[in-house]
Amino acid sequence: MDVQRSSYIFIALSIIAMFLITGVKPEVRDICPGVCHAGIEPDCDTLCISMGFTGGYCQGLTCCCNPKSSKSSIINRPI
């Protein structure tokens, strides 16, 4: 009986591990990190700039950040 129970536990844990590795992840909202409202500090633009984005905008009551620039500000020229 213990061997059968152990195999069921192993199968159940394997299925759970499979879902954790491949499966459902919560939506990461790092592009929209805050809330827009008149009394909230810091404002959306300041929040996004402090996180390394180029700026921010309000989408309803959600503060969303502009995409980060793909160009580097420092360009190394070949010798």
UniProtKB/Swiss-Prot annotation:
Family, per entry: Belongs to the DEFL family.
Keyword Signal: yes
Location of the protein in the cell: Secreted
Gene Ontology CC annotations of this record: extracellular region
Disulfide bridge map: 32-65, 36-58, 44-63, 48-64
Major localisation: secreted
Keywords recorded for this protein, A-Z: Antimicrobial, Disulfide bond, Fungicide, Plant defense, Secreted, Signal
Keyword Signal found: yes
Protein name as catalogued: Putative defensin-like protein 80
Gene: LCR81
Signal sequence annotation: 1-26
GO biological process, one term: killing of cells of another organism
